From Swiss-Prot:
Region: Disordered, residue numbers: 1-20
Tissue expression from the record: Expressed in all tissues examined, with highest levels in brain and eye, and considerably lower levels in skin, gut, heart, gill, liver and muscle.
Protein name, entry field: Cytoglobin-2
Top-level lineage group: Eukaryota
Record's subunit section: Monomeric.
Pfam families cross-referenced by the UniProt entry: Globin
CDD domains: Cygb
Keywords associated with the record: Cytoplasm, Heme, Iron, Metal-binding, Nucleus, Oxidoreductase
Alphabetical list of SUPFAM superfamilies matching this protein: Globin-like
Similarity remark: Belongs to the globin family.
First-tier enzyme category under EC: oxidoreductase
Globin domain sequence ranges: 18-167
Function text: Probable multifunctional globin with a hexacoordinated heme iron required for the catalysis of various reactions depending on redox condition of the cell as well as oxygen availability. Has a nitric oxide dioxygenase (NOD) activity and is most probably involved in cell-mediated and oxygen-dependent nitric oxide consumption. Under normoxic conditions functions as a nitric oxide dioxygenase (NOD) but under hypoxic conditions the globin may switch its function to that of a nitrite (NO2) reductase (NiR), generating nitric oxide.
């Protein structure tokens, strides 16, 4: 019965390749460096996200009218959301050994963004790309091709779980011009 339910939920969606033990170790090691300056890195990620994809700001009334990256950087609301994003990633990284915990955290994120905030799920894919871009720029010395591959697999898994939550709640795409 559980297998049938899982098949229904994942129908039409290819599950990403699972992380190996080595890849989980790589992610945990590099994340320790990133998380040491999590607020600054998180702010950099969100600023890049909003500058390159200004349509994403529509979901944030507190700073949707901000155009200047310096103004965004000073926004306490943006900093608060950056901490939330980084803390969610931290929870995932800390629990890579426990796929059920990772899934439950990401399903909560997905459901909240679908129900409460009405965020188009494509923004999670876009944000994943921005995260990878910033990590490579800010931590280039340790962001080898092997590290990039590990993080890319993690971002694919995050997106898969989050969009799975959207599917689970019966998300209907709002418009094709949102992005």
């Amino acid at each position: 019965m559980e297998k049938e339910r899982e098949d229904e939920e994942t129908e039409g969606r290819e599950r990403p390749e699972p992380l190996t033990d080595v890849e989980r170790g790589i992610i945990k090691d590099t994340w320790a460096r990133v998380y040491a300056s999590c607020e600054d890195v998180g702010v950099t990620i969100l600023i890049r996200f909003f500058v390159n994809f200004p349509s994403a700001k529509q979901y944030f009334s507190q700073f949707q009218d901000m155009e200047d990256p310096e103004e965004m950087e000073k926004s306490s609301q943006l900093r608060k959301h950056a901490r939330r994003v980084m803390n969610a990633i931290n929870t995932v990284v800390e629990n890579l050994h426990d796929p059920e915990k990772v899934s439950s955290v990401l399903v909560l994120v997905g459901k909240a963004h679908a129900f409460k905030y009405k965020v188009e799920p494509i923004y999670f894919k876009i944000l994943s790309g921005v995260i990878l871009e910033i990590l490579a720029e800010e931590f280039g010395e340790c962001f080898t091709p092997e590290v990039q591959t590990s993080w890319s697999k993690l971002m694919a898994a995050l997106y898969w779980h989050i969009t799975g939550a959207y599917t689970e709640v019966g998300w209907v795409k709002l418009s094709s011009s949102a992005v």
